[in-house]
Amino acid sequence: MSGFTRYNKILNLFSEQRSSWTVLEISDELKTPSSTIYRIVRELVLAEFLESAAGAYFRLGPAFIKFNRIINLSDPLVRAGQPFLKKLANENPIESVNVLARLYGNKVMCVADYKSPFFKNNTSYQKGKLMPLIYGATSRAIIMKIVGKSLEDLLKQETFYDDNDKDTFFKNLKNDNKKGYCKTEGQVDKGLIGFAVPINNKKLGIEASLSSIFNSIDFLPEHEPIIYANLTSYSLLIERYINQIFDDIQNYHQISS
């Protein structure tokens, strides 16, 4: 291991399922001498990316909490959209989970969410969790506005069951564009139905979506136009606020220079 890769590989070992590691365990997992791992872990502890846990174990450190706060206060999409998620939930006709998600490379990540107090199930779309690109309304709404070679490049590493599955995907994407929103049921989580609309800002390089997720058992056809109207209204508000944030950033840099 060399350069940043060595730090990245160690940090990526930590997960919800495995939150603490010893130097020896990391050494075995990465097939790297324990002396090398010890030196890197010591550097990560000094930088507060890791901290000592019980015994000889280490866990993720306070640096991540600090950076999470900075992102929450500075990220344009989070700043513009998070305040509206609870309002959207309150205006939806049934209990819902409401999600802001964004494209990072070729994966989708939830950056903010709000769950109605009486919503019974959990969704896979949770803050900080990477999600598949081609399944679920939340993800599909993001890529429905990407066209041509950009879309081809984005989907290069995606695996479809067969050519028919791929054709169906593009046909659905075309229909989504005509309707202005995506709707899927059970693609990511069984028993849940999702609706999503795109949010874009080319100046800030933001390709994102706003979505509402419901229990399928609660959903009635007459809810659909209300859900679509709510999502559309709030997505326009969020895009307007993102534009204001862009103007603020631009003005700040002009004054600084």
Which residues fall in each region the model found?
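Juxtamembrane membrane-water interface segments immediately C-terminal to a transmembrane helix
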Residues: 29, 75, 225-229
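N-terminal helix-turn-helix
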Residues: 1-74, 236-240
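Short, highly charged C-terminal tails/helix-capping segments
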Residues: 244-257
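Amphipathic alpha-helical effector-binding/dimerization core
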Residues: 60-154
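Extended hydrophobic
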Residues: 163-240
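Short strand-connecting beta-turns/loops that link adjacent beta-strands
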Residues: 55, 105-106, 202-204
